[in-house]
């Protein structure tokens, strides 16, 4: 059962929401334009606001549902964590798109909303605050990722816990996926939310 949960979580994460929306609404391949990501931000820049919101909600749902399925069928915290990271892996490296997907932010949010809604909402709050102040989605995502393990530590009250370790892994993964954005931020070349790439 555990293997089935993990495999299903990966397939759920692999659902190429942004790619399908881009193809259906504008006949474009998001992997070849803008940032090359199939996530909500690239959808926003190249397809539109409402399609981007739809993609964001679905991508959050992928992480949340994967963990909730694991919680329903098992009481093992480790399986919940693996299910969540499997959904994130599917989102980043979707089998249907030859491994070229999103940057794990929305699906990661969904995962942590399921594991600890307080930590998930705190991270979302940081994202929104930084976005409001700077208009940089990438900086907002990176800021939320950096603070995620800190929020998880305060929630748990200890370091030695699978939730803390996975929050650290996801944070590092999100930062790594934004490495080109970090270079552009340093050079002053990163696009703001109201700018085209």
UniProtKB/Swiss-Prot annotation:
Hydrolase in keyword set: no
Residues annotated as signal peptide: none
Catalytic activity: an acyl phosphate + sn-glycerol 3-phosphate = a 1-acyl-sn-glycero-3-phosphate + phosphate
Membrane topology of this protein: Multi-pass membrane protein
EC number: 2.3.1.275
TM regions (residue ranges): 1-21, 50-70, 77-97, 111-131, 136-156, 157-177
Biological process according to GO: phospholipid biosynthetic process
Annotated compartments: Cell inner membrane
Chief location bin: membrane
Sorted UniProt keywords: Cell inner membrane, Cell membrane, Lipid biosynthesis, Lipid metabolism, Membrane, Phospholipid biosynthesis, Phospholipid metabolism, Transferase, Transmembrane, Transmembrane helix
Gene Ontology terms, MF aspect: acyl-phosphate glycerol-3-phosphate acyltransferase activity
Family annotation (Pfam families): G3P_acyltransf (PF02660)
Function, as annotated: Catalyzes the transfer of an acyl group from acyl-phosphate (acyl-PO(4)) to glycerol-3-phosphate (G3P) to form lysophosphatidic acid (LPA). This enzyme utilizes acyl-phosphate as fatty acyl donor, but not acyl-CoA or acyl-ACP.
Protein family membership: Belongs to the PlsY family.
Protein name stated in the entry: Glycerol-3-phosphate acyltransferase
Organism: Prochlorococcus marinus (strain AS9601)
Gene name of the encoded protein: plsY
């Amino acid at each position: 059962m555990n293997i089935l949960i993990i495999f299903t979580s990966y397939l759920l994460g692999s659902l190429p929401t942004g790619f399908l929306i881009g193809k259906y609404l504008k006949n474009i391949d998001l992997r070849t334009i803008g940032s090359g990501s199939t996530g909500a931000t690239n959808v926003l820049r190249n397809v539109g606001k409402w399609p981007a919101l739809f993609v964001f909600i679905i991508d959050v749902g992928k992480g949340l549902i994967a963990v909730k399925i694991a919680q329903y069928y098992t009481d093992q915290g480790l399986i919940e964590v693996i299910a969540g990271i499997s959904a994130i892996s599917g989102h980043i490296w979707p089998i249907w798109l030859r491994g070229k997907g999103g940057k794990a932010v929305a699906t990661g949010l969904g995962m942590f909303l399921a594991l600890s809604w307080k930590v998930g909402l705190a991270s979302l709050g940081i994202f929104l605050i930084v976005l409001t102040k700077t208009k940089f989605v990438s900086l907002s995502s990176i800021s939320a990722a950096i603070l995620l393990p800190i929020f998880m530590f305060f929630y748990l009250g200890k370091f030695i816990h699978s939730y803390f370790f996975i929050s650290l892994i996801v944070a590092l993964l999100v930062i790594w996926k934004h490495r080109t954005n970090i270079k552009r931020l340093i050079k002053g070349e990163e696009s703001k939310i109201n700018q085209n790439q």
